[in-house]
């Protein structure tokens, strides 16, 4: 009798272990929450309306404006997508958008400011923001944290 009880307990234990293994395997292979899905930047009308090309970065009509550099493959760009789109819609400082995947944008670790010729300009990667005043780059910000801080500071100045 003792041997039968032990055998029954072991069968139940193996059954439960099998169920747990199956549950673990199926939950790990689920794609539902593994990769967040983001909207394309071009799904926002403000991005479409305010998109510019690399040679145009220093010759916009406004005296002061910013350019947000993004890539559709950049997770950090998508992470701050709602914030930068909201900024572009609600703040008086004009925001332009430049998709580095569609433009040959020079990438350089030297954050150049004081540049007045687009051929000398560069960004440090995506996401990045260039601030332009009187056709001169006055700020060159890169990285999600610094870009979000910059947008918040500008929002406070504008309001």
Residue positions per predicted region:
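Bacterial N-terminal signal peptides that target proteins for export
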Residues: 4-16
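Solvent-exposed loop/turn segments at secondary-structure junctions
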Residues: 72-76, 102-105, 136-137
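N-terminal leader/targeting and pre-domain segments
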Residues: 29-63, 152-159
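C-terminal motif of bacterial Sec signal peptides marking the signal peptidase cleavage site
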Residues: 24-27
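Thiol-based oxidoreductase modules, predominantly thioredoxin-like and allied folds used
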Residues: 93-112
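Non-catalytic, surface beta->alpha helical segment in thiol-disulfide oxidoreductase systems
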Residues: 124-159
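Structural alpha/beta surface segment adjacent to cysteine/selenocysteine redox centers
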Residues: 106-126, 130-136
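Local sequence-structure signature of Cys/Sec-based thiol-disulfide redox active-site neighborhoods
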Residues: 53-96
């Amino acid at each position: 009798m003792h041997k039968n009880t032990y055998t029954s307990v072991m069968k139940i234990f193996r059954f439960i272990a099998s169920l747990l293994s199956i549950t673990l395997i199926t939950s790990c292979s689920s794609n539902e929450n593994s990769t967040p899905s983001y909207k394309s930047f071009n799904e926002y009308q403000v991005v479409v309306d305010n998109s510019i090309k690399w040679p145009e970065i220093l010759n916009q009509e406004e005296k002061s404006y910013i350019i947000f550099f993004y890539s559709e493959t950049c997770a950090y760009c998508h992470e701050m997508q709602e914030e930068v789109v909201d900024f572009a819609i609600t703040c008086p400082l004009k925001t332009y958008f430049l998709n580095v995947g569609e433009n040959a944008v020079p990438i350089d670790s030297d954050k150049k400011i004081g540049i007045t010729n687009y051929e000398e300009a560069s960004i440090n990667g995506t996401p990045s923001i260039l601030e332009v005043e009187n056709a001169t780059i006055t700020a060159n910000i890169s990285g999600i944290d610094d870009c979000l801080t910059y947008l918040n500071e500008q929002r406070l100045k504008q309001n």
